[in-house]
Amino acid sequence: MKLSDFDFDLPSELIAQYPSSERDNSDLLIAVTPPIKTKFYNIIDYLKEGDLLVFNNSKVIKAQLNLGKNITINLNQKLSDDSWSAFAKPARKLHVNDEFYFDNHKVIITEKLAMGEIKVKFKLNDISVFEFLNKYGEMPLPVYIRRSHSLCHPVATTTGSKTYLNNDWIPWSNHGMTNTQNDNDRYQTVYSQIEGSVAAPTAGLHFTKDILDKLKAEGIQATFLTLHVGAGTFLPVKTENIHEHKMHTEYCSITPDTAEIINKAKQEGKRIIAVGTTTLRTLESSCNNGIVKAGSFKTDIFITPGFKFQTADMLLTNFHFPKSTLFMLICAFAGFKEMHELYKYAIKEAMRFFSYGDATLLCRK
């Protein structure tokens, strides 16, 4: 199939710039004929006792660092305890061995790669990289969230190739609350546990603790796996022949308990509902002859129409970009023609797209 087969017209005003007023107040589109548009807090009406929801419990880290000199880096993947790959903007301003100081901590540029990718090393005093990021980093919002300058930026002092940043902040805010304060909460699922993602597994953003409690009370099970979402999730497909596209790799983990719960539910004929494309990709990557295997691994699975699914019966997901690998995935899962028609309906109904947008519940075709 061609890349152009997965294109559709999306009005820019439907790209959600902010989350809904409450997590579960977003819209939910049930992919039946005709489609049913409801509120997410009604999702329990479309599930049944014995269903198994599989969630991605990865936690978004504050992966964006402002280095001063109008340079920003977004961490991508952990390489070792003190080294990460990252994307720099603009990368041309950086050189190998450049050092950036955050109080008494140091970030060193160790390698420059193609397409703005770099490698960095953290020299920290008595704190972990995640603790450092919690103090100095910002939530890494996707590039399509374009707001006015309302984020906080650090004060920087530059001496030669060394830049010193302190913990003073210049606040610019249109809402009485900086965007980072709100995003720190809303760009994170309520059940996130394991730090490592640089973008949110967004299908889970709609769930509240109250909804999770109600699902449990109705006999709807839940279990958790981990996929750390990398920055590559936003990379566009640039080849017209989609099968020439090279997927990014991401770290995944499934515990023995989770694998046992999923396999038992499958054996008993219970419905498996993947919450998000990250969950579905992890399940399919781990599955061998219909059995989900426990373990930690990296995946670069690229799911396109014709793929033979072995795990989930349903998929809860947000609305995706035209010509994206995730739109290709849902076309593979729920039907090429059906998804184009569903998206036309969603656009007509002015549903909100992408990370802070609305959700849809799909059945496997």
Swiss-Prot record:
The keyword Cytoplasm applies. Pathway: tRNA modification; tRNA-queuosine biosynthesis. It comes from the Bacteria. It is an enzyme of class 2 (transferase). It catalyses: 7-aminomethyl-7-carbaguanosine(34) in tRNA + S-adenosyl-L-methionine = epoxyqueuosine(34) in tRNA + adenine + L-methionine + 2 H(+). Keywords: Cytoplasm, Queuosine biosynthesis, S-adenosyl-L-methionine, Transferase. Its EC number is 2.4.99.17. Transmembrane segments: none annotated. Belongs to the QueA family. GO terms for molecular function: S-adenosylmethionine:tRNA ribosyltransferase-isomerase activity. It comes from Rickettsia rickettsii (strain Sheila Smith). Its main location: cytoplasm. One of its GO terms (biological process) is tRNA wobble guanine modification. GO terms for cellular component: cytoplasm. Transfers and isomerizes the ribose moiety from AdoMet to the 7-aminomethyl group of 7-deazaguanine (preQ1-tRNA) to give epoxyqueuosine (oQ-tRNA). Monomer. The keyword Transferase applies. It is found in: Cytoplasm. It holds the Pfam family Queuosine_synth. This is S-adenosylmethionine:tRNA ribosyltransferase-isomerase. InterPro entries: QueA, QueA_dom1, QueA_dom2, QueA_sf.
